[in-house]
Amino acid sequence: LISSTLAVQDKVRDQRLIMHRKVKPNPAIFVQNSSTAISFSAGNANLWIENSYVGKGWKLGSCQIITGIPENDWEISLPDGICLDVVPMGENGFVARPYGLDDVFKGALNSPHTMFTGIPFTEWMEQRGLSTDDFRGRIDDLQAAPVFPLTESVEELGVLLRWMTTEPDLAEGRALWLNSKKFSADEISARANLQR
């Protein structure tokens, strides 16, 4: 996605020649239909933000895709390679779907070869005090496993995303995740309310 768009759009090598007040500090930064209250730097290479609100409390890295984020006042810091997708579900719900840029979404949850947010899923569970017993449904394949929580609160959504990505000791995030209805990546694709 990012490399293809860069190949099509990056025709000017010297960004200073682009007569625009907000020259991109890196040609591989793409912001589509979004509101951003942060400043970008050359370190934000390979960044795609679409249909999202990225507030002043956000810190982004590189190699990231950020999509569907509702208006928020979160304090969130994402390391390189961590992506966020928020999917509207039902009339008022949001499903939090973080992932690693290179995750392939396949493999059993208890396999050390199944990657999630750029680390083995077994390590992700261990960091958060979870086991496969905490999943209600399929655990034989990450694509079909109910990993992604539903919430109707934007504030809770931010807590869930922080817990699922960079703050595994966040007790509130763990409690929210354990008590939420969860969907698999397959279910999200089938049930998303894209008209919202």
Tell me what each language-model feature is:
Residues 1-196:
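Left-handed beta-helix
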